Amino acid sequence: MSSARFDSSDRSAWYMGPVTRQEAQTRLQGQRHGMFLVRDSSTCPGDYVLSVSENSRVSHYIINSLPNRRFKIGDQEFDHLPALLEFYKIHYLDTTTLIEPAPRYPSPPVGSVSAPNLPTAEENLEYVRTLYDFPGNDAEDLPFKKGELLVIIEKPEEQWWSARNKDGRVGMIPVPYVEKLVRSSPHGKHGNRNSNSYGIPEPAHAYAQPQTTTPLPTVASTPGAAINPLPSTQNGPVFAKAIQKRVPCAYDKTALALEVGDIVKVTRMNINGQWEGEVNGRKGLFPFTHVKIFDPQNPDDNE
């Protein structure tokens, strides 16, 4: 298993903001397993999406923002996003852990458009193009049709901005329903890195779900792994020696810490590769790749 190569506390390394699902696909498709990014959800404003390259595809996992300011992915809850990423550094989502963030592209994101022929007298104004119809839900909302150009007046909230249409009417618009227009610069400079376009909301059923337990992948899915016959715990205790040190994540109370040379009494061998065992009275889960089974009756196997 590859080790993680990122600092979860460095939000700028992995949070990409309002990146569309299609752009996430483009950035991650064909990349190494475990490359990922965190983006804003266009389906549920305020939520996030963890997009990951795994098993020759790109999976998208919804991260719900809870009222108690915690975050939920699958059946797991976390105090903050760095804690969630730390957890999935050593726990598999489906077939991979999180290894490294996707690199930031210096050029404007795919799908962003240039604002043609905008009045030079309004050089400091920010324009957006509407992605589809919005009828308006409240009196303060600004209804619009798909394809309109709007001028942003102010941004009082993260997901709701004040805008003006061509008729001079002002009202609130939902940010996920529009895309920013990147003004072409005569000096050839790119637009602001945060000028990402929002895509049409993706359906809820398009999201993947992480495994409900904390498994490692099956032996067969581990490249280069040899599939050897394993003893059964039904025939009596099975013992193994730790061949790799393991320091569990502080957020995971189910993991078993291991020191090289520890003798582990294996109590269960799950087919997903996450075994259960006991060391000096401590019980928990550990990856089978960290131990080597031996026969207590044969000292030669202890070498």
Curated annotation (Swiss-Prot):
The keyword Phosphoprotein applies. One of its GO terms (cellular component) is cytosol. The modification Phosphotyrosine is found at Y127, Y207. Residues 184-203 are annotated as: Disordered. Phosphorylated on tyrosine. Phosphorylation is prominent during early development, but decreases at later embryonic stages and in newborn mice. Residues 14-102 form the SH2 domain. One of its GO terms (molecular function) is RNA polymerase II-specific DNA-binding transcription factor binding. One of its GO terms (biological process) is anterior/posterior pattern specification. Interacts with DOCK2 and EPOR. Interacts with phosphorylated CBLB and IRS4. Interacts with INPP5D/SHIP1. Interacts with BCAR1/CAS and NEDD9/HEF1. This is Crk-like protein.
